[in-house]
Amino acid sequence: MVALLALLLGLPPAAARPLRPVATYSIVARDPSTGELGVAVQSHWFSVGSNVSWAEAGVGAVATQSFIDPAYGPLGLQLMRAGRSAPDALKALLAGDAQRDVRQVGMVDAQGRAATHTGALCIPAAGGQEGKEYVVQANLMDKPTVWPAMARAYEAAKGDLADRLLAALDAAEAEGGDIRGRQSAAIVVVKAKSSGRPWADRVFDLRVEDNEAPLVELRRLVKLQRAYNHMTAGDDCVAVADWACAEREYGAARTLEPRHAEMAFWYAVALATAGRLEPARPLFAQAFKADPRWRELVKRLPGVNQLPKDKALVDAILAIR
């Protein structure tokens, strides 16, 4: 049935045999306060996020692991997009999968309905747990305490969905995690409602492909992404000449990443464009010190309307040391 559904939905059928076991712990969740959907995962396997984690705004999220069939991701989303609940979608896919006993899958739909499956032949310790609008699942773990610890950590964590997903991963690692160690991790968070532009609906879409401490690196990337999200919002404010908004967003980015030269530079450009050169001076100085080529970029901006065509202003910026 999985192969038939794939053909009906225009997807190629999965391979006849299962892939190698992607020993994994993951969490799939919907934030009841914002409606955001997300998946976070860690594994002793290269590039775990490229096959395990799937999410679509306004539809649902899927983690497919163990002897992985990646088709559960797009097929699960297709079924949920068509109106099936996460439990119904997972049941339908498992019913037609002759290798269901080696699969481990978690799904949550846009209404928060959740389901998890751990096949009888998943390598132990393996299991899953369903909570309110989330599921956790793990296989090839050091101890069977991993997934209950994930659930407790997620429920107790503060912050937004990304914060809570990361807390669940940290709790899994604290319980021993994958019996073989750690290698890669990923997180994807999408907005509650689809804009019709999938690229604009992803709040986080980050992977650590190969790292001795993937969860540490994933947290670093999440923090950096938060800063860039503020930078993007600042750019949007600049586009409509809302300078107060731009300063607020660029300032938030700088608070998160105070040593980041590019963030300092564009914040300075926004200030200078708004007629506030004095507070822009230390920001330009930071960028120029990091790399003198930022000075050359200043010269190029007025011609493309990214700085006022004001020679005195440009000269004043270039004179900053």
Language-model segments: residues:
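Alpha/propeptide regions of enzymes that mature by internal proteolysis
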Residues: 16-180, 187, 209-240, 255
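Short coil turns that delineate tetratricopeptide repeat
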Residues: 258, 289-293
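Residue-level recognition of tetratricopeptide repeat
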Residues: 235-236, 269, 302-303
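Bacterial N-terminal signal peptides
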Residues: 1-10
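Register position in tetratricopeptide repeats
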Residues: 239, 273-274, 307
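TPR alpha-solenoid repeat register
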Residues: 263, 297-298
